Amino acid sequence: MQITTMPVSAELLTTYSMIPISFEVKSKLIVELVDDGLGGIALHEEEVIPTYVKDYDEIKGEGPVRWLERFNTSDWALFVAREERIPVGGATVAFRTPGVHMLSLGGREDVAVLWDMRVHPGHRNLGIGSALFSEVAKWAKERNCKYLQVETQNVNVPACRFYVRQGCQLGEINRLAYSAPEVAHEVMLIWYLDLQ
């Protein structure tokens, strides 16, 4: 496997978007407030019946090909993992970009965001995601970032477990983050990797 780092471009995003990001939702993390939060917060996993497929690229206005329309990507980097010249995984990191709500952490410029990560279903659980994550963290550290921030949802339990294995810790839980009807039931989970 070979991982290359490139600036974001329309041509590359078209190729990148062909790597599926969809996953089957088999369980979700339930947020339980103990004593309305004063006694703590607990997460527990609950099976989802029936299971369903979630595809971030199918959400209106989302998907890699739209990023150039929405953001100045000059401080972004795109990582592509290839096997025999075929893209099988990718990751995108955003840095110093006005309009990216996740980078508005008090106006700090020492935080980078793992904006997108995807591995082709036939190549998952082979270490590609870990290799991509490592490259993203290295890139952020080279830019003197203190933290790498990652957003997931409570319905993407495999991603939550993946980020914990990479050394991330849960920093934020927002039960009211999403208002669009198709995702209003989801909880935003923000993970942080300490790069210091």
Residue ranges and their predicted role:
Residues 11, 157-158:
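Short alpha-helical
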Residues 18, 22-30, 34-111, 115-116, ...:
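Acetyl-CoA-dependent GNAT
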Residues 111, 147-149, 190:
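Structural preference for beta-strand elements that scaffold enzyme active sites
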Residues 119, 125-138, 142, 161-165:
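Conserved acetyl-CoA-binding loop-helix of GNAT-fold acetyltransferases
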Residues 2, 106, 153-157, 166-172, ...:
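C-terminal "cap" of GNAT-fold acetyltransferases
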Residues 140-152:
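Conserved GNAT acetyl-CoA-binding A-motif
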Residues 7-13:
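Short polar catalytic/cofactor-binding loops
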